[in-house]
Amino acid sequence: GPGAPAAQDSEGIAITRSGHMFISSEGLPQREPRLPPSVIEYTRRVDYVGPLTIPPKFLQPPAGPLTHGVRENQGFESLTLTPDEQRLFTASESALAQDGEGASFTRGTTARLLEFVSEGGRFVPRREFPYPLDPVPPVGFTPRFMINGLVELLALGDTEFLSMDRGYAEEAGDNGRRATFIRIFRTSLDGATDISAMDSIRGRSNLKPVRKHLVLDLNAVKELPPELRVAALDNFEGMCFGPTLADGSRTLLIVSDDNFSPRQRTWFLLFRIVR
């Protein structure tokens, strides 16, 4: 609609019960002037309402070295509304440039989880929390690129979530080997430090991070189709609740992004939630 940005790297979507939509974008930091990460609001008829206010610490300089804000292709992958629709959450996929380095085989890193609160009919930024990410799991080759990042959130309540972490490493060359690691956690904000007043958390050792408990390691699921062999799990980065089964069990649906690549596929996997 009028006023909407002409280009986006859209990733997450959250829809209210009335059909109102919010769409997160990683932005386009690889071009100058840079398009910043965003969460954009649309009506039920997909009319453009406008962007939510993003705290400056997530924003990159308009040109020059990326010394501040989200790194390239590591912005707002995730997006979720709480069940009462009073809070909206997204997160940087990995550490902000001023917060620290990304994950490697020998070190983890810390992403920032960002809360918006509904006030007067609009969502405004409120708190931020340190979200810990593990080191990239070992692979049997020397990668040219590696990452472990937070790619999806699914709210269970005001402070409880399912979160999806995706690790990835790739070898140089068009036919280089790849490895993907998908893990889903039950996540709690209870007791975590609000870091919204801190432009940088680099070197801070007294922060209490978001608490995480592993509930699904996709690489360890033996019932996956043969094409989804452990060493080449696809690019899973979406998650929502699926249909309720006949016995009353809830389900979880996860989806992969094929990146328009002939080497990848779009998969939908449905899991029964066992309490």
Feature locations, PLM:
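Sequence/structural signature of beta-propeller domains
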Residues: 1-275
